[in-house]
Design a protein with these regions (language model features):
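A glycine-rich dinucleotide-binding beta-alpha-beta segment and adjacent secondary-structure elements
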Residues: 80-142
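Flavin-binding catalytic cores
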Residues: 16, 36, 60-100
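Active-site lining segments that contact anionic ligands and/or coordinate catalytic metals
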Residues: 18-20, 39-41, 130-131
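Short glycine/proline-enriched loop/turn "hinge" motifs that connect secondary-structure elements
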Residues: 31-39, 124-129
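Glycine-rich, aromatic-lined ligand/substrate-binding cores of catalytic
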Residues: 34-70
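A conserved FAD-binding loop/helix module that cradles the flavin
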Residues: 130, 136-163
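Mid-domain catalytic core of redox enzymes
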Residues: 1-35
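Short, glycine-/Ser/Thr-/acidic-enriched flexible segments
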Residues: 4, 27-30, 47-51, 140-141
Length: 164
């Protein structure tokens, strides 16, 4: 989603920029025989500033995560059918919150500047140090889910169609 006149894919000046992001409902599928997942999931991701998050003391960090969560959810719910009108019910029925920042990602994955996707070293052609092993996805430097798909297409085109 993008809630601004222009999409700015850049590091925000603030901790986060909730004006644009990705909404993911990962278990929103039709299952066989009418089965359903016992709970729903909603993920919202937006651009964030690693340096700003990294500079916060622990108490401020925790309070800012909650402030940013509320701001992100407020914008994202506006893009879902009846989202704004269901905000209170969603809050009441929430069983688990997992809020993370670039600081969290850096701590657990060592990704450069807490980046969410891909390897810190991009390989445009997908090559690795092993013959016949190629990375295809966000490791080509494209962004997000569509970027991962484009990365796969680019590597497949280079390796299979062109025979590089």
């Amino acid at each position: 989603y993008n809630d601004d006149d222009v999409f700015r894919y850049e590091r925000p000046d603030e901790l986060t920029d909730p004006r644009s992001g990705v909404i993911c409902i990962p278990n929103n599928y039709r299952y066989p025989n009418g089965e359903q997942m016992p709970e729903g999931q909603l993920r919202v991701t937006c651009l964030a500033n690693y340096e700003k998050w990294g500079a916060l003391d622990e108490n401020t960090y925790r309070s800012q995560k909650e402030i940013c969560r509320k701001a992100m959810l407020d914008v994202a719910l506006g893009y879902l059918p009846n989202g704004k009108s269901m905000a209170k019910e969603l809050e009441e029925r929430t069983e688990l919150l997992d809020i993370f920042s670039p600081r969290t990602i850096k701590k657990f994955t060592s990704h450069l500047d807490g980046a969410l996707y891909g390897s810190p070293r991009k390989s445009r052609d997908g090559s690795t140090q092993f013959s016949n092993l190629y990375l295809a996805g966000s490791d080509q430097g494209y962004v997000g889910i569509v970027g991962a798909m484009l990365g796969g297409v680019a590597v497949a085109n280079n390796r299979i169609l062109r025979g590089d």
